[in-house]
Amino acid sequence: MRYLTSGESHGPQLTVIVEGVPANLEVKVEDINREMFKRQGGYGRGRRMQIEKDTVEIVSGVRNGYTLGSPITMVVTNDDFTHWRKIMGAAPISDEERENMKRTITKPRPGHADLVGGMKYNHRDLRNVLERSSARETAARVAVGALCKVLLEQLDIEIYSRVVEIGGIKDKDFYDSETFKANLDRNDVRVIDDGIAQAMRDKIDEAKNDGDSIGGVVQVVVENMPVGVGSYVHYDRKLDGRIAQGVVSINAFKGVSFGEGFKAAEKPGSEIQDEILYNTELGYYRGSNHLGGLEGGMSNGMPIIVNGVMKPIPTLYKPLNSVDINTKEDFKATIERSDSCAVPAASIVCEHVVAFEIAKALLEEFQSNHIEQLKQQIIERRQLNIEF
């Protein structure tokens, strides 16, 4: 299973082609659009999300509500393109027209791809870099993840997310499954404790008023995974390695951990390893889940717990110092419309990126041409956990 996205932030549309989805999977576009809507929300979002109405159009690979087994193409229209048609269109424009529109960027923003991307691809107008490196591309990745969540639901695998920390203000590290699921999306910062939610809003407002931005930590949980997905045999087949690569490929994500993560370094092994237990109903299970459902690069049947660290968004309304690439003079960096905090939205993006990595790993483990075949193999693997 793989996908390829295309499109620029202010171009006409984002397009994604997904290959490897089994045939006969029931897909409703409203299910995908419901997930797309979640990405647009969250306290601290900028004006761009008031312009866009992200909805997906499926243009191939699905017929009469069911996948065909062929590549699935989805399109997300950029409504803001109406204001950028001339500058972002494919047709050539004159230097005079470009200058009159004041859209050329020569002052790179610290923390963005602007300067290094301009060097790498020889772009003197850094808009050519920022348009593709923008987090707008994550809308297409959420569409892919939403499709994967439909697949996972058919396999009785649940995936959900929350915010753990914003700007140094922390929610509890872990909640039991029922509390977690019962409180999803209860507020606009996606934390479970309402008192902490208000403190986070105040912190976001403070950053916005200062022309600054703040980051945080998000958590994704995958429940009811069959055992043995991934492999200890080769480095590139380890499930935690694949999930980690997916998470840190999200714009502004700078770290990832599993289970107790970096706190494991503070404790002795006797407090971190999860003891193995058995009963006839569950089969093998663990007495705790400090390792986050992963052992030896494989799922062990316990919930997979993924923690992702997002740095503050580098576009600031109180811009940092930079250098004009044409004149080499010191300037304040270019200001582009942006969010003061995108951590709540990033938790949704992270959830869908993990959903893709899980679905991809499952389809490699249980190679299937159609959904019925895949379901049967999953049933057999779950039974193995009891009978082994």
Curated annotation (Swiss-Prot):
<dbReference type="Pfam" id="PF01264">
    <property type="entry name" value="Chorismate_synt"/>
</dbReference>
<dbReference type="InterPro" id="IPR020541">
    <property type="entry name" value="Chorismate_synthase_CS"/>
</dbReference>
<feature type="binding site">
    <location>
        <position position="39"/>
    </location>
    <ligand>
        <name>NADP(+)</name>
    </ligand>
</feature>
<protein>
    <recommendedName>
        <fullName>Chorismate synthase</fullName>
        <ecNumber>4.2.3.5</ecNumber>
    </recommendedName>
</protein>
<feature type="binding site">
    <location>
        <position position="337"/>
    </location>
    <ligand>
        <name>FMN</name>
    </ligand>
</feature>
<feature type="binding site">
    <location>
        <begin position="132"/>
        <end position="134"/>
    </location>
    <ligand>
        <name>FMN</name>
    </ligand>
</feature>
<comment type="similarity">
    <text>Belongs to the chorismate synthase family.</text>
</comment>
<dbReference type="GO" id="GO:0005829">
    <property type="term" value="C:cytosol"/>
</dbReference>
<keyword id="KW-0456">Lyase</keyword>
<keyword id="KW-0285">Flavoprotein</keyword>
<dbReference type="GO" id="GO:0008652">
    <property type="term" value="P:amino acid biosynthetic process"/>
</dbReference>
<dbReference type="InterPro" id="IPR035904">
    <property type="entry name" value="Chorismate_synth_AroC_sf"/>
</dbReference>
<dbReference type="InterPro" id="IPR000453">
    <property type="entry name" value="Chorismate_synth"/>
</dbReference>
<keyword id="KW-0521">NADP</keyword>
<feature type="binding site">
    <location>
        <begin position="251"/>
        <end position="252"/>
    </location>
    <ligand>
        <name>FMN</name>
    </ligand>
</feature>
<comment type="function">
    <text>This reaction introduces a second double bond into the aromatic ring system.</text>
</comment>
<keyword id="KW-0057">Aromatic amino acid biosynthesis</keyword>
<feature type="binding site">
    <location>
        <position position="45"/>
    </location>
    <ligand>
        <name>NADP(+)</name>
    </ligand>
</feature>
<dbReference type="GO" id="GO:0004107">
    <property type="term" value="F:chorismate synthase activity"/>
</dbReference>
<dbReference type="GO" id="GO:0009423">
    <property type="term" value="P:chorismate biosynthetic process"/>
</dbReference>
<comment type="subunit">
    <text>Homotetramer.</text>
</comment>
<keyword id="KW-0274">FAD</keyword>
<feature type="binding site">
    <location>
        <position position="296"/>
    </location>
    <ligand>
        <name>FMN</name>
    </ligand>
</feature>
<keyword id="KW-0028">Amino-acid biosynthesis</keyword>
<keyword id="KW-0288">FMN</keyword>
<feature type="binding site">
    <location>
        <begin position="311"/>
        <end position="315"/>
    </location>
    <ligand>
        <name>FMN</name>
    </ligand>
</feature>
<dbReference type="GO" id="GO:0010181">
    <property type="term" value="F:FMN binding"/>
</dbReference>
<comment type="pathway">
    <text>Metabolic intermediate biosynthesis; chorismate biosynthesis; chorismate from D-erythrose 4-phosphate and phosphoenolpyruvate: step 7/7.</text>
</comment>
<dbReference type="GO" id="GO:0009073">
    <property type="term" value="P:aromatic amino acid family biosynthetic process"/>
</dbReference>
